[in-house]
Amino acid sequence: MKKYIFLFPLIFITAVLQLKAQERQDNLWKAVFMDYSLSNSSTLRLETHVRTRQFLAENDQYLVRPSISFKVGKFAAVAAGYTFLSTNTPIDRTLENNLWQQFNFSIPVKRSSYFGWIRLEQRWQSKNNVQNYGARIRFRTGFQFPITAEGASFSPKLVVFNEVFLKIKTGFPYEFNQNWTFFGFQNKLGNQLRLLTGFQRITVDKGAGYLHKNVWSSILFYRL
């Protein structure tokens, strides 16, 4: 009898975890971010993203994201921008026009830094001539650590962050949308170039189940 008392909670927990179907993708994300300084306190940025599923086998998303940012203190800035997304979905592509506003910070801690952002998005999506509007808020927080001695000619940094996306209704976050967890490295490739590359684990709530993405993500930053 005691054996069944211990087995019942285990069976119950297993059943709960399997209520939602699980799907997995192994993807590759590539992006280029170009920055142009208008002044000491303002910067224009253009992001272009190409995302593929099953590494390079299938197109997933294209993104174009222009924005402008303004420093509001020694360690903080505000930004606003627009994103166009084209996503490969069954039957037809889903197109999205997205306006967003962001507060971001980066605080030095000795040779390391603590960084993050809060981004608010207004999203207009179109698929099969059906229009939908939604909004969400994104919270990212992370750390950047040096992994070599100070003054070394080769000085990559370890970058770790987590970002949670929440859908918004009547002005308040109310529903989990997705979560990103990233572990990778960033290194300067010259005075104007730096590369951020690493592994990103993404969990997306699809309603009837969860989609898990294992992503190798690489971003090349270029300052004009």
Predicted regions and their residues:
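Bacterial Sec-dependent N-terminal signal peptides
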Residues: M1-D26, L224
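Start-of-domain marker
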Residues: Q22-A79, S86-N88
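Residues that define the transmembrane beta-barrel architecture of outer-membrane proteins
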Residues: D26-L28, D60-Y62, L95-L99, Q131-F139, ...
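Residue-level signature of outer-membrane beta-barrel architecture
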Residues: Y36, F70, F105-I107, F145-I147, ...
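Repeated loop/turn-to-beta-strand initiation elements of outer-membrane beta-barrel proteins
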Residues: S41-L46, F75-A80, K110-Y114, A149-S153, ...
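Transmembrane beta-strands of outer-membrane beta-barrel pores
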Residues: T48-Q54, Y82-N88, I107-V109, L120-W124, ...
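Outer-membrane beta-barrel "beta-signal"
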Residues: F103, H212-L224
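Detector for outer-membrane/organellar transmembrane beta-barrel domains
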Residues: W117-Q125, N129-L166, Y222
